[in-house]
Amino acid sequence: MTEKNQDAVTEEQGTEVVLQIQRIYVKDVSFEAPNLPHIFQQEWKPKLDFNLSTETTHLAEDLYEVCLNISVETTMEGSEDVAFICEVKQAGIFAISGLEDVQLAHCLTSQCPNMLFPYARELISSLVNRGTFPALNLAPVNFDALFVEYMQRQQAQEESKTEEKEKKEVH
């Protein structure tokens, strides 16, 4: 196939989708163990509180920063004693083109965080290990399911706003 034919195929099929990692980095990290050393004298029965969020920033044309924010707070079951708090902001710069609207939102809130999560999980595991706590292996996160849930919430909010507006117009 000649170069002209390849360009024509790309134009016929639509815009070529590009997703490239430009850089992955740690934006912020914090590890606190406020109740050391007496926490080690207690029986290890942890209660884990895991929070996750993402932030996206449009840096330039087709260039985005995605930041995965993870907070893990572990308290001892049956008490208020905090064993440790670990917070990580794992970020990446991604070149993304050929996507618009919902597809771009899906890429930024699902595919990019999927690429960042293993780095954040390893960093958290390492920090917990350096605090000499038992191993912490965070389970994989289904970012696709989180995106679908988010879109359903957005749609429900839009529908309720429309219904409220219609009720006000009737009265």
Swiss-Prot record:
One of its GO terms (biological process) is protein transport. Its main location: cytoplasm. The keyword Phosphoprotein does not apply. One of its GO terms (cellular component) is cytoplasm. It comes from the Bacteria. GO terms for molecular function: unfolded protein binding. InterPro entries: SecB (IPR003708), SecB-like_sf (IPR035958). It is found in: Cytoplasm. Disulfide bonds: none annotated. The keyword Mitochondrion does not apply. Keywords: Chaperone, Cytoplasm, Protein transport, Translocation, Transport. Homotetramer, a dimer of dimers. One homotetramer interacts with 1 SecA dimer. One of the proteins required for the normal export of preproteins out of the cell cytoplasm. It is a molecular chaperone that binds to a subset of precursor proteins, maintaining them in a translocation-competent state. It also specifically binds to its receptor SecA. Belongs to the SecB family. This is Protein-export protein SecB. It comes from Histophilus somni (strain 2336) (Haemophilus somnus). The gene is secB.
